[in-house]
């Protein structure tokens, strides 16, 4: 089976604000590691690390983590795209 990418495009704020992590190098590292989430354990570990290092994450950071977890689960289910348009969410299968 060919390898494929899964993309997620939802109408939610999902980012790390400067008020949460101001150091750009740390922020870039965290973005890369969040993008690498593949399992529930990865998600739990990342959330725990964020809490320990930077305090309580806001809604945008929690959304970012949830989207990374959703993307990993969707990929395992051979979903290539999750796209929200208005109130409709479309799932495209491989």
What is each residue range found by the language model?
Residues 1-94:
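Accessory helical-bundle/CTD segments and flexible terminal tails appended to RecA-like ATPase motors
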């Amino acid at each position: 089976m060919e390898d494929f990418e899964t993309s997620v495009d939802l109408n939610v704020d999902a980012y790390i604000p400067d008020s949460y992590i101001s150091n750009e190098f740390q922020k870039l590292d965290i973005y890369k590691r969040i993008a690498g989430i593949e399992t529930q354990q990865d998600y739990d570990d990342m959330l725990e690390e964020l809490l320990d290092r930077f305090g309580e994450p806001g809604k945008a950071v929690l959304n970012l983590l949830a989207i990374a977890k959703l993307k990993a689960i969707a990929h395992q289910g051979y979903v290539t795209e999750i796209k929200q348009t208005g109130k409709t969410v479309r799932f495209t299968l491989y």
